[in-house]
């Protein structure tokens, strides 16, 4: 299994599939925001940024998947999935255990050199409250689904990382 994962990580289609699935989740988030009129909170916006990090990882890996450049994509993937998982767990904790002492920020804070909330306010502006439960599906709230999603992305990234230590076998059909 690890050898086949190693072989798969060296193909462009796998990296593009990663970028496509994550970008699809971004489109779903924009649907929730602009069509269903759910208000994203600060942690929701940060989780979106983590998803965009996974999209970027897929695109970096797709540039040259058979070269060591894929390790850069893998590092971005691991970091983004880990940060997204941490944010989703924090968001879930705020929703499940509301407290006046534990809240999220009122405004997103991006670096001065990358003010995404000013450049694309329709995507990166936060107007909701982190403690408000706005949507659920199959008895899980939105941040709980994000735990599942980021956990799956992280688990697959770790498996791909471990698979790099198992070189694929060369198929020699004519030697005996």
Curated annotation (Swiss-Prot):
The chain crosses the membrane at residues 15-31, 50-65, 72-89, 145-163. Keywords: Cell inner membrane, Cell membrane, Chaperone, Disulfide bond, Electron transport, Membrane, Oxidoreductase, Redox-active center, Transmembrane, Transmembrane helix, Transport. Residues 1-14, 66-71, 164-176 are cytoplasmic. Pfam families: DsbB. It is found in: Cell inner membrane. Disulfide bonds join 41-44, 104-130. One of its GO terms (cellular component) is plasma membrane. Gene3D superfamilies: DsbB-like. One of its GO terms (molecular function) is protein-disulfide reductase activity. Residues 32-49, 90-144 are periplasmic. It is a multi-pass membrane protein. GO terms for biological process: protein folding. Required for disulfide bond formation in some periplasmic proteins. Acts by oxidizing the DsbA protein. Belongs to the DsbB family. This is Disulfide bond formation protein B. It comes from Sodalis glossinidius (strain morsitans).
């Amino acid at each position: 299994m690890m050898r086949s994962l190693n072989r798969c990580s060296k193909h462009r289609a796998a990296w593009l599939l990663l970028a496509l699935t994550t970008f699809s989740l971004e489109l779903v988030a924009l649907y929730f925001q602009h069509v269903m009129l759910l208000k994203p909170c600060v942690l929701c916006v940060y989780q979106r940024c983590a998803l965009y990090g996974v999209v970027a990882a897929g695109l970096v890996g797709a540039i040259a998947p058979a070269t060591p450049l894929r390790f850069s994509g893998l590092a971005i993937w691991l970091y983004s999935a880990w940060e997204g998982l941490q944010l989703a767990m924090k968001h879930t904790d705020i929703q499940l255990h509301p407290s006046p002492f534990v809240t999220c920020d009122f405004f997103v804070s991006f670096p001065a050199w990358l003010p995404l909330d000013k450049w694309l306010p329709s995507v990166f502006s936060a107007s909701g409250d982190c403690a408000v439960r706005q949507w659920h599906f199959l008895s899980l709230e939105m941040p709980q689904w994000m735990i599942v999603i980021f956990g799956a992305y992280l688990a697959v990234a770790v498996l791909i990382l471990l698979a790099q230590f198992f070189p694929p076998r060369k198929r020699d059909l004519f030697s005996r």
